[in-house]
Each structure stands twice: as structure tokens, then as C-alpha cells.
Amino acid sequence: MKIGIIAYQGSFEEHYLQLKRAFDKWSINGEITPVKIPKDLKDIDGVIIPGGESTTIGLVAKRLGILDELKEKITSGLPVMGTCAGAIMLAKEVSDAKVGKTSQPLIGAMNISIIRNYYGRQRESFEAIIDLSKIGKGKANVVFIRAPAITKLWGKTQSLAELNGVTVLAEENNILATTFHPELSDTTSIHEYFLHLVKG
């Protein structure tokens, strides 16, 4: 199994370590590779789009010619997990809590509507306990950093976890989106669930 991690910015190293732990837990002989240009997508079984600044990630991905290829592969069934800014990249509809509608480059493959900076600047970073029973796990302490919120889901998209009634983890077929940072959590539950998607 080969998993690619988009490596322009964001926590590549932390996702790498969480994936390694999840591989070890499941006794999977897996390979993890950084993805920056289209040829890096060759032969991968799944891809992670980490946090960072979603507009920057989108612009760089577009400039390097990977944005359209990613969209094509994800639409054709490549398993993907987008965390925080990565979730924004996957959404079909994006607006900003302060400035309203945005026109940033997106993959736009998931039937969700996302509001960037949902919790406001004063809550730039916080931790919260969420219930992961819908993915067969217990409660987990997770980290939110300038987090967006999934405010609308349609089609086959399901909400898998909520915080105060707002979706923080959603799934649609081969696509998983989290508004928190699972790579900074002390549990590998989310990465394990992603590997379960990859294994099919």
C-alpha cells in the first residue's frame, strides 16, 4: 500500500508519523511518499491533503499542474483525506466567516459546504473531545487550528462526528474530510479509518 501526502506546506511530518503508527497497528507493509507534482500521483493507493493555508495550497497545486489531475483521480475513486485546509480544498462550496464567498482554486469533489475561519480569530487554536462511535472508535481529544466548519452536506455525504451540532468529520464514498488536525491527536483512529477506506 502506497499513500501520498501533498507536501507544499502543512504538517507532512506529523501525518507521516501517524500513518506509520496506523500501518504498524494493522501490520501493513506500507510506503508513504511526498506528492508535489503530477508524476508523484502515479501508483499511489490513497492521498492525504494536510492543513496549511488553503488558498496557497490551491494556487501552488494549480501552478504545478496537479490540481486537475488530483480532481480527476479523486472523482475516479482514489481515496483521499483532507484535513482542515485539505477539507476546504475538497469542498464544492466555500465561503469565509468574515469576507463571504471566496474564489480560490479548489478540487471541489465533495458535496459539502464549508465556512473558513468558522470559530473566529479569538479561537485560533483549541482542543475538544469528539465522539468517533460512527467509525467504530471511542471518544478522542482533537486539535482545531483556525478551523473551518462543514455547514451543509448533500448527496451521499454523511456526517461522522460533530462538535456542538456542527459537522467536523464527513465522508462521501472515497472522500474523508476533517476540520480538525488528526495528525496532532494522540490517537491514530482517523488515519486507521482512512486506511480502511483505502483497503476498500
Curated annotation (Swiss-Prot):
EC identifiers of the protein: 4.3.3.6, 3.5.1.2
Pathway terms, separated by semicolons: Cofactor biosynthesis; pyridoxal 5'-phosphate biosynthesis
Record SUPFAM superfamilies: Class I glutamine amidotransferase-like (SSF52317)
One of the Pfam families matching this protein, by short name: SNO
GO cellular component labels: cytosol; glutaminase complex
Membrane-spanning intervals of the chain: none
GO process annotations (BP): glutamine catabolic process; pyridoxal phosphate biosynthetic process; pyridoxine metabolic process
Role description: Catalyzes the hydrolysis of glutamine to glutamate and ammonia as part of the biosynthesis of pyridoxal 5'-phosphate. The resulting ammonia molecule is channeled to the active site of PdxS.
Subunit details: In the presence of PdxS, forms a dodecamer of heterodimers. Only shows activity in the heterodimer.
Protein name as it appears in the record: Pyridoxal 5'-phosphate synthase subunit PdxT
Source species of the chain: Saccharolobus islandicus (strain Y.N.15.51 / Yellowstone #2)
